[in-house]
A protein has these predicted regions:
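N-terminal glycine-rich anion-binding loop in soluble enzyme alpha/beta folds
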Residues: 1-50, 117-152
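Short, well-structured alpha-helical segments in soluble
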Residues: 45-59, 159-171
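Glycine/small-residue-rich loop that forms an oxyanion/phosphate-binding "nest" at active or ligand-binding sites
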Residues: 53-95
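Periplasmic-binding protein-like
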Residues: 62-67, 115-116, 171-178
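Hydrophobic, well-structured mid-protein blocks that either form specific transmembrane helices
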Residues: 83-136
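Hydrophobic alpha-helical
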Residues: 166-190, 206
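C-terminal functional extensions of proteins
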Residues: 200-245, 315
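Intrinsically disordered, low-complexity proline-rich tandem-repeat tracts
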Residues: 241-244, 254-314
């Protein structure tokens, strides 16, 4: 995995990884620029990406993922494809980006109208909306924080509040942008409340990367990760709604307080060890990289909830 120099949510990425897969992360060199379109261009330069990918070569990854949303949408669809080609040339393995993974996930869901949440400024948020328009996706509503730094410090409550604000009109799904925004524990609650698939930058990145390995991302109550039904059945958009409200049956859903979620525990500042992004490969017995246990063993939510949604395992 190649990630920006300020990426601080390594722990969150691991939560989607099954225990037989190894994840390795490297970062792009530090750039003294606030989060902006200029920074997005700097951290997505092909030379920088190539160096990051080559830094991962010794671990023999089977897929390379560039974990940065703004860095992969700033050049438009053409620029995103060029980034993938540059990384593939450097590492000689399949490569993908967060924005490309988002488009892939929306196609998988059959979603063409989305609500959008970002921590960015208005100009960066608009650039993402323009990218989506180019690939045929309409943004029905949006909410953004206007941040230029320390995005990983945003609490889950703020993410949930923005999601509620953004979902107006008839959206097929909600997308929470930025790989530095914590989302893993918020997704199940938002899907139950909003009755639609909820996608996040880290989620779609890991889903798409693991998919190329023939593996499944770990994440209970996340619509994108539902197993495919028999051919001919509806897309996940309907499946997610039915999971909480079966056809012909209406019931009240009580979402547990977002305060019940564990605090965000970022990895903190990490010294750059190379260009942006993560590498993923099946774990071998000799691997020194620890693996993440599946998130299927979970504790129940507080009794105040009428749903059987699981509470994520506490951080170690």
């Amino acid at each position: 995995m190649v990630a920006p120099f300020d990426f601080a949510l390594d722990r969150e990425l691991w939560r989607w990884v099954p225990d037989d897969i190894s994840l390795r992360v490297t970062r792009t060199p530090y750039v003294p620029v606030e989060v902006s379109l200029d920074l997005a261009r700097l951290v997505s330069e092909h030379e920088t990406l190539g160096e990051a990918v080559r830094a991962l070569g010794a671990s023999e990854p089977e897929v390379i993922a560039y974990a940065c949303t703004s860095g992969s949408f700033v050049g438009g669809p053409v620029g995103e494809r060029a980034m993938c080609e540059a990384m593939t040339r450097a590492g000689e393995v399949p490569s993908l980006t967060t924005t490309g993974a988002l488009v892939e996930a929306l196609e998988e869901l059959g979603a063409s109208r989305i609500a959008l949440v970002t921590p960015y400024t208005e100009s960066v948020t608009q650039a993402l909306e323009d990218y989506l328009a180019e690939v045929g996706v309409t943004v029905t509503g949006r909410a953004f924080l206007g941040l230029t730094r320390h995005i990983w410090k945003v609490p889950y409550r703020s993410v949930v509040d923005m999601a509620r604000e953004a979902v107006v009109g008839s959206a097929d799904a909600l997308f929470i942008s930025c790989t530095n925004l914590p989302t893993y524990d918020a997704i199940p609650q938002l899907e139950a409340e909003l009755r639609m698939p909820v996608l996040s930058a880290n989620q779609v990145t890991m889903w798409a990367a693991l998919r190329r390995l023939g593996a499944h991302a770990v994440g209970p109550y996340q619509g994108l990760l539902l197993d495919r039904r028999e051919a001919g059945e509806a897309h996940y958009v309907r499946d997610v709604r039915d999971a909480y409200e079966p056809p012909g049956e209406t019931r009240e859903v009580s979402i547990p307080s977002i305060q019940a979620l564990p605090p965000v525990v970022p990895m903190g500042p990490v010294a750059p060890i190379g260009p942006m992004g993560p590498a993923i490969s099946p774990a071998s017995p000799a691997s020194s990289v620890s693996s993440v246990s599946p998130a299927s063993s979970v504790e129940p939510l507080p009794e105040s909830s009428t749903e059987s949604l699981p509470e994520p395992l506490p951080d170690e």
